[in-house]
Amino acid sequence: AVVECNLEDGSSAQCYKFTVAYQPEGLEIGPFCPSNIDEKGGIWDWDGEKAGLYRLDRDFFEMLADQGYRFYDKDGRIVISDPGSGQPPEADHTCLMATPDKDVTITMLLPIEPRMAEKALSLGTVAKVGVALDGVPIFADAPSVLDTGHLPALDVCGGHIDPGGWYHWHATSTDIATVEKTEGVAVNCALAQDASAAFGFAFDGFPMFGSLEADGSKPEGLDKCHGHMGETRLGKTYHYHASTEFPNLPTCLSGVVAENNFSTTSSTGIGSQGNTRRGPGQAMPPGFEEAAQILGVSTEDLMNALKGNGQRPNIAAAAEKLGVTEKALRSALPQPPQHAR
């Protein structure tokens, strides 16, 4: 449907409003967490020592154990928890795997006529990126193991189930084969791969494509959001391109997004109307909402400030960005789970 909407720059516009199911019919998802270290699960973009994209297998979990993050018991069984259960994990380090809820629906808003913003919108942890052509929502990085102690496993196409019960992407899934080659990881996503195809639309209304132009050439003149103006199958327009490394999504949005552009019928998780139960792998790690309240900032601003470039957050830089002292920030933040080498 076409509806009147308000954009985040204060202007009025017309938006497409549409509702989708928890997961497209016929979409194959998984695997996520393996049941033991001898099985192969999904993938994870590790941002600690020896950072990179990995399959969730024995080599990966033993590497994490060597770094002090042990996700399996003495028999090699992976410790798995459901972040949508409302109960905190019973161990310091668990592989998170939510349960789908077939009754959940998702409603989104996209501007019909995209407008460039005066300043690009930075996309921090679990920020809303857009929606794929198959109707699956797209989000930025999932919370880091370094922040929460827990691992919200992605499947081999770069998606997983939100604690609210609905599936979403954390990657340009139709071009993840390019990432597979770049990262040297056997991903084997079952989705049809096309590096030049349209993947979806960002929440500012601009289209998102794979890592190549329609003619198979590499895109030129990309800005900091990995977008540019140029000819596409949709005509000449500003558009985004996937990167060749994981996560292969825009790091910021160049256009203006609609207010309240994402909601679900779930009682928990991102976009829920009554989100009173949060846990690792949800919109915010445990204790971060309380920290934001103590500091007098929004949870989104707090997570964006703490989001590093593949390593541990720079507390001093985050404090400066938030306009608080480093001591105040360290005091407010929850302590991560202890791990021993």
Predicted ranges, named:
Residues 1-147:
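Solvent-exposed N-terminal domain segments of exported/luminal and surface proteins
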Residues 4, 219-282, 338-341:
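Long, compositionally biased interface segments
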Residues 268-293, 303-317, 327-341:
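Disordered, low-complexity segments in secreted/periplasmic proteins that are enriched in proline
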Residues 146-154, 164-218:
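Short helix-loop boundary/capping segments
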Residues 118, 138, 175-180, 208, ...:
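Short loop/beta submotifs within extracellular cysteine-rich repeat domains
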Residues 193-223, 278-290, 309-313, 336:
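Intrinsically disordered, low-complexity segments enriched in Gly and acidic/Ser/Thr residues
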Residues 104-110, 132-136, 162-177, 233-247, ...:
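Extracellular/lumenal glycan-associated surfaces
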Residues 152-159, 221-229, 303-307:
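Short, recurring structural edge motifs at helix starts
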